[in-house]
Amino acid sequence: MGIFVCRNSLRMLNVRWLYHRCLSLYNSNHGFNEAKIKEKLAQFTGGSVDLSKMDNGIAEICINNPSRMNAFTGTMMIELEERISDLENWKNGKGLIVYGAENTFCSGSDLNAVKAISNPQEGMMMCMLMQNTLTRLQRLPLISVALIQGKALGGGAELCTACDFRLMTEGSEIRFVHKQMGLVPGWGGAARLIHLIGSRHALKLLSGALRVHPENALELGLADNILLGTEDGFLSEAENWIMPYIKGPSDVSRAVKKVIISGREQKLEDALRTEKEIFGTVWGGLANLQALAKGTKHK
Ligand SMILES: CCC(=O)SCCNC(=O)CCNC(=O)[C@H](O)C(C)(C)COP(=O)(O)OP(=O)(O)OC[C@H]1O[C@@H](n2cnc3c(N)ncnc32)[C@H](O)[C@@H]1OP(=O)(O)O
């Protein structure tokens, strides 16, 4: 019995490991040494990445390092990866809101860590970790929203592009400040920005390190809405905003996000095949049968 349990747990661990390997971009075949870069990043402490999962199927991730305008320390990069793993295993989840503590989003990577990891090899290794994590965030079967209050700078601007939607509050800004730091985005923010607003607009934002205010972001298609409420109400406003998109049973909501991911990321023929597979998971399912039995009309 003990051996059986042990073997089963090992199989589960293997499946989980393989699953993460599939969702991630980089592994040891790409020269990525995850353990080594995590060991290095663990030296840069401070702040936290907090996850709460609610009964209504919405989770919240709080980037929490307000004394440094929610900059990502090394330990926070490691924690973000752990929180995404947790969400990958949350089978009832439907939505995710990513926000920053104390009414500002995130000021990018912690400059103390940036200074200490100044050689290109370690810099690229840190990028691989963050690209893996943010790609996994983007591929979660949850509808995700970045709630941007205050500033989303550098890596903070990159983080918000990994969410499906961006809600900005009045006076907030998204700014790819990398060029002013002698850098380019490395957490996948340039590639994702081009998908969102096209290469001409992306080039302007990156080469001019332009401040993108809410109205401008809305026009560009970078933001999806501007929230006009008060500081203590923005989280619940974001929750209300996401609600119509996650209404109904989680398996259907998750299937919707999955067909979007495959349509976005795969070649047409592969995407069509994946879509058929996902369709098979909901066809004849409980929600489908209930809708048929009710004679649902769409007036
Ligand atoms: C992936 C690559 C990247 O992310 S490169 C981009 C890195 N980020 C930056 O360069 C942002 C640098 N910070 C700033 O421009 C300003 O601090 C901003 C965010 C505009 C806030 O200005 P302000 O409202 O005047 O506040 P402040 O400068 O007094 O900051 C408060 C305390 O927070 C700190 N802080 C801020 N950002 C970071 C950061 N990224 N890394 C480490 N610390 C940061 C400031 O140093 C300041 O700390 P202290 O109160 O002086 O101890």
Curated annotation (Swiss-Prot):
Gene Ontology CC: one annotated term: cytosol
GO MF terms here are:
carboxy-lyase activity; methyl/ethyl malonyl-CoA decarboxylase activity
Checking Pfam families in the record gives: ECH_1 (PF00378)
Q: Give the first-level EC class, as a single word.
A: lyase
Has keyword Amino-acid biosynthesis? no
Domain of life, per UniProt, equals: Eukaryota
Chief subcellular location: cytoplasm
Q: Which reaction does it catalyse?
A: (2S)-ethylmalonyl-CoA + H(+) = butanoyl-CoA + CO2; (S)-methylmalonyl-CoA + H(+) = propanoyl-CoA + CO2; (2R)-ethylmalonyl-CoA + H(+) = butanoyl-CoA + CO2
- EC? 4.1.1.94
UniProt keywords (A-Z) are: Cytoplasm, Lyase
Instruction: List where in the cell it is found.
Output: Cytoplasm, Cytosol
Q: Does the keyword Cytoplasm apply?
A: yes
Q: Which family does it belong to?
A: Belongs to the enoyl-CoA hydratase/isomerase family.
The protein's role, per its UniProt record: Decarboxylates ethylmalonyl-CoA, a potentially toxic metabolite, to form butyryl-CoA, suggesting it might be involved in metabolite proofreading. Acts preferentially on (S)-ethylmalonyl-CoA but also has some activity on the (R)-isomer. Also has methylmalonyl-CoA decarboxylase activity at lower level.
Full protein name:
Ethylmalonyl-CoA decarboxylase
Species this protein is from = Xenopus tropicalis (Western clawed frog)
